[in-house]
């Protein structure tokens, strides 16, 4: 299932069993999303255009599992992160967390996730890897 942003806080408790299983995982595979004008969070209806612009203004560069973070890999406080209904971000310090992401729009988000230790493995293409190493 796709991660989502709940319309209210009570919706977060709907899948406690699944969230508990996710917390116990020793390996996680995640995608890294960007926050460009046609970001999947917006296109898929999880955030409004106004929320996307507010996230961008707050310095957000990417998201994983719906959790929005800035260029330092820090979660953006408040805003849509208070409504995320997906599993918490896995800890790259205690489990293998592999991100799959590519493309120039995602370089800032991938860099932030790797630098902060949100992920400790990456599947990407050669062009994106070169941009990350530049």
Annotated model-derived regions:
Residues 1-134:
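Conserved phosphate- and dinucleotide-binding cores of soluble alpha/beta proteins
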């Amino acid at each position: 299932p796709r991660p989502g942003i709940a319309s209210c806080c009570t919706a977060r408790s709907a899948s406690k069993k699944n969230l508990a299983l996710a917390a116990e995982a020793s390996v996680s595979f995640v995608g890294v999303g960007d926050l460009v004008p046609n970001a999947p969070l917006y296109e898929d209806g999880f955030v409004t255009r106004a929320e996307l612009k507010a996230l961008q203004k707050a310095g957000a560069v990417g998201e994983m599992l719906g959790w929005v973070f800035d260029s330092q890999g820090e979660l953006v406080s408040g805003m849509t992160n208070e409504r995320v209904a997906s599993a918490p971000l896995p800890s790259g310090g205690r489990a293998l967390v592999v991100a799959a992401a590519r493309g120039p729009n995602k370089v800032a988000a991938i860099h932030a996730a790797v630098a902060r230790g949100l992920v400790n493995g990456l599947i990407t293409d050669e062009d994106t890897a070169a941009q990350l190493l530049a």
